[in-house]
């Protein structure tokens, strides 16, 4: 009996620690892949909406032919979506401000629907001038942030994403890498930043929701310890 009581106990923390690191890395990869395909899908859907006004971010035949001159645009949108979706929850943790506003999938789906609606409005509704279009889309985009986000980090990242994405797209156009199908370039520039801002908020909400599973696992392990 004494010998049995004297048996050394195995450390219990090494296993969960390794499991936690492994699950974190795997969770990160899975979230990135999911966000990538969501971004590609939304890029194709939004391009179909813009075709109604003959203003597209890439030629329409990119959907039917992988050998299109702008075949790389949807994968770039997917990559950007993955980066944005992973960046939002990372920024929340870094700032110590966990996002708790409307954290459920139904809210995320409504956010996606509103984002698609904003894009549809830019393609379908006829505005008197480009300034009216810009102000309307800006109000709708800020309304999307206020309704589904309301975080300072979300707003700041959205503005930064809109500025950077608009700058990159304009540089690509000026250098002839690709061009818009619409001759009215001022019209495109009037709605592009608002769409990028709303898209950043939308992908950020999706990324935050996907990250909730990992947060729940970490919380459960901390309670067990």
From Swiss-Prot:
Ranges annotated as spanning the membrane: 29-51, 71-88, 104-126, 130-148, 154-175, 190-207
Gene Ontology, cellular component aspect: endoplasmic reticulum; SREBP-SCAP-Insig complex
Protein's name in the database: Insulin-induced gene 2 protein
Membrane topology listed for this record: Multi-pass membrane protein
Species of origin: Gallus gallus
Disulfide pattern: none
Presence of the UniProt keyword Disulfide bond in the record: no
Stretches assigned to the Lumenal side: 52-70, 127-129, 176-189
Family to which the UniProt record says this protein belongs: Belongs to the INSIG family.
Cytoplasmic side: 1-28, 89-103, 149-153, 208-225
Motif position, KxHxx: 219-225
Swiss-Prot/TrEMBL keywords: Cholesterol metabolism, Endoplasmic reticulum, Lipid metabolism, Lipid-binding, Membrane, Steroid metabolism, Sterol metabolism, Transmembrane, Transmembrane helix
Residues carrying the site annotation Required for the recognition of 25-hydroxycholesterol: 115
Record bears the keyword Transmembrane: yes
GO biological-process terms attached to the record: cellular response to insulin stimulus; cholesterol biosynthetic process; SREBP signaling pathway; SREBP-SCAP complex retention in endoplasmic reticulum
Function as written in the Swiss-Prot or TrEMBL entry: Oxysterol-binding protein that mediates feedback control of cholesterol synthesis by controlling both endoplasmic reticulum to Golgi transport of SCAP and degradation of HMGCR. Acts as a negative regulator of cholesterol biosynthesis by mediating the retention of the SCAP-SREBP complex in the endoplasmic reticulum, thereby blocking the processing of sterol regulatory element-binding proteins (SREBPs).
Coiled-coil residues: none
One Pfam family this sequence matches: INSIG
Recorded domain comment: Binds oxysterols in a pocket within their transmembrane domains and interacts with SCAP via transmembrane domains 3 and 4.
GO-annotated molecular function: oxysterol binding
Cellular localisation: Endoplasmic reticulum membrane
Annotated InterPro entries: INSIG_fam
Main location group: endoplasmic reticulum
Subunit structure of this chain's protein: Interacts with SCAP; interaction is direct and only takes place in the presence of sterols; it prevents interaction between SCAP and the coat protein complex II (COPII). Associates with the SCAP-SREBP complex; association is mediated via its interaction with SCAP and only takes place in the presence of sterols.
């Amino acid at each position: 009996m004494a010998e049995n009581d004297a048996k050394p106990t195995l450390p219990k923390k090494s296993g969960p620690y390794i499991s936690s690191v492994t699950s974190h890395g795997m969770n990160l990869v899975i979230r990135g892949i999911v966000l990538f395909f969501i971004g590609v899908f939304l890029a194709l859907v939004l391009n179909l909406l813009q075709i109604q006004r003959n203003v597209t971010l890439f030629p329409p035949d990119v959907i039917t032919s992988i050998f299109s001159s702008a075949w790389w645009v949807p994968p770039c949108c997917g990559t950007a979506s993955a980066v944005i979706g992973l960046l939002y929850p990372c920024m929340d943790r870094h700032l110590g401000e966990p996002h708790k506003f409307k954290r459920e999938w139904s809210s995320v789906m409504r956010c996606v629907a509103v984002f698609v609606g904003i894009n549809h409005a830019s393609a379908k509704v006829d505005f008197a001038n480009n300034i009216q279009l810009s102000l309307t889309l800006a109000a709708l985009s800020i309304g999307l942030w206020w309704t589904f986000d309301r975080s300072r980090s979300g707003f700041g990242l959205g503005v930064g994403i809109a500025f950077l994405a608009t700058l990159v797209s304009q540089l690509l156009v000026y250098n002839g890498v690709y061009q818009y199908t619409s001759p009215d370039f001022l019209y495109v520039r009037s709605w592009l930043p608002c769409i990028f801002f709303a898209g950043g908020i939308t992908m950020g909400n999706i990324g935050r929701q996907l990250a909730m599973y990992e947060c729940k696992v970490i919380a459960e392990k901390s309670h067990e310890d």
